Amino acid sequence: MRLRRLFAIFALLAVAASAAAAQAAADPTVALLVDLIRVNTSNPPGNERLVAELLAPRFKALGFDVKIIQSPDTAKAVIVARLKGDGSKRPVLLSAHADVVGVERDKWTVDPFAGVVRDDQVYGRGAIDFKGGMAVFARAAMMLAERKVPLARDVIFVAEADEEGGGGYSTAWLAREHWADIDAEFALNEGGWIMKGDDGRVRYVSISTADKSSVPLTVTAHGTSTHSSMPRPDNAIFALSRALAKLSAYETPIELTPAQTQFITALARTSAPPMSGYFRDLIGPDPVRARHADSVVSRDPLMHSLIRNTIAPVIIQGGFRNNVIPGSASANVNLRLIPGSDLGAFMATLGRVVGDSTIELKTSAPIYTQTAPSSENTDLYRALVNAAHAQFPGAEVTPYLFQAGTDAGAWRSRGVPVYGIYPYPIDADELTRMHGNDEKVSTASLKQGTEMIYRMLVEVAGRR
C-alpha cells in the first residue's frame, strides 16, 4: 500500500514538473530560445544559415521585409528582417550573433543542444551568449508587428555570423559588402549586464558604450630538441612555463575610463558596507586605499577584468612524442585592452616582466579595433535607460565598458552608436556558466528582458 502511495506521489510530482516546463515553454520568448538552442551553431563551423532559415518564415508571417544574405561559405548566412516605419526617422537596429562556442560535452548534465527547460531555467549552449539575447530582441521586434505599433522609423533585426571566431564572415564582412542593409541611426548589441544580488533583486543595469580590444599574443620558447633521456637546461617547455608563471604573477595596474568610473560610483551607491566603501576608495584620490580596495574588489573576476588590461593563456602547444624533447613550445595568450591603451608600451612591459630575451612575444592585429565610446546623448540610449528604470524600479542604470569584445565595431567604426546589453537579469553563478558548462537563463528573466526591450523600441521607434 505504501509503495502504491509513493508511486502515486512520484507520478504526481512528475506530472507537475512536466506541466510547469510546458507552461514555461509556452512563453513565446522561451519557446523561441529553445528552438534556437536546438540548432547547433558551434563555431567552427557555425552553420548560421540554419538560424536564418528558422527565423525567416516567422518574420515574414508578421509583415517584415526579410533578406537572407549568403556568404561565400554556403553554411554561413545572415538574416536581415526589417519592419517598416514611415521613414520620418532613421532606422534602429538590433543585432545578435547566431554562432556559439563549442562545449565540453562530458561536463554538462544535460544535452547542450536540446533546449532543456527545467526548474524554470532554459539550459543550453547560447542560453546567455547570445541566443537568449537573440530570442529577446527578435520577440520584442515581433511584438511591434503583432500589436500594430505605428512606427516613425524602420526596426531592423540582424542575426549575424562569425562573432565567436572560426571564419571570415563576421559583421566586418557584412558591413563591407552589404552596408546599405544594416545602416542605422544607432544599434543595440550584446554587452552590459542586468545583475541580481543575493536576494534575487536587480541591483544594476549596465549599458556598454565601448568594448575592450582583444589582442592575440603568442609566447614562444626555443630549446634543443633531443632524446628525452638526456634533458638539457634549455628545455623549451620549462622555459615557456617560467615565462607564463611570471605573466601570471604580474598584476596589471588599474586603468579607469569615464564609463568605468560611473559604473563603480553606481556600485558604491547600491552596495552595503563594507563593499560600498571599497568601491568609493577604488576611484578615490588615495592610492594606498585604492590598492587595498582593489585587492578586495578584484576577488570578483568580472570586476578584476573591468578595471585593468588582462592576460589570459588559452592554448598551450609543445611536443609530439613521449621520448622527444621538443625544440619549441608556445602558448596562445588572449590580451584584453582597455580603450586608449598603448599596445606597444604594454608589450614592452610584458617583455620586462618575462625578463628572458630568448622568449619570443608576438602579437597579431587586434581582433576588435578601438573606437570612441558611443555617446550617451542619443534617443536609443535614453529609451533603454527609461525602459530599464520602468522594468526594474530601484536599480541603478549606468554606462559601462564591456570587459570582453563584441562585433559592434562594424557600426562604431562608421560613426553609428552601438549600445550593449545582455537583456535578462542573471546572477554570479549564471554569469560563470557563460562559455562554460550547463549554461542557463531563467524563464522569468527572458520575459522581463523581452518586456524591457519592447518598451525601449516603442519609445525610440514609435510614432507619436
Kindly give the residue locations of the regions a language model identified.
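N-terminal secretory signal peptides that target proteins for export/translocation
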Residues: 1-3
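Extracytoplasmic/secreted envelope proteins and their assembly/folding machinery
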Residues: 30-36, 49-52, 56, 134, ...
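Acidic, glycine-rich active-site loops and adjacent beta-strand->loop/helix elements
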Residues: 74, 98-100, 159-167, 190-195, ...
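N-terminal helical capping/dimerization or prosegment-like subdomains
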Residues: 23-105, 328, 332, 343-344
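Bacterial N-terminal signal peptides
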Residues: 7-18
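A glycine-rich helix N-cap at a beta->alpha junction
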Residues: 176-192
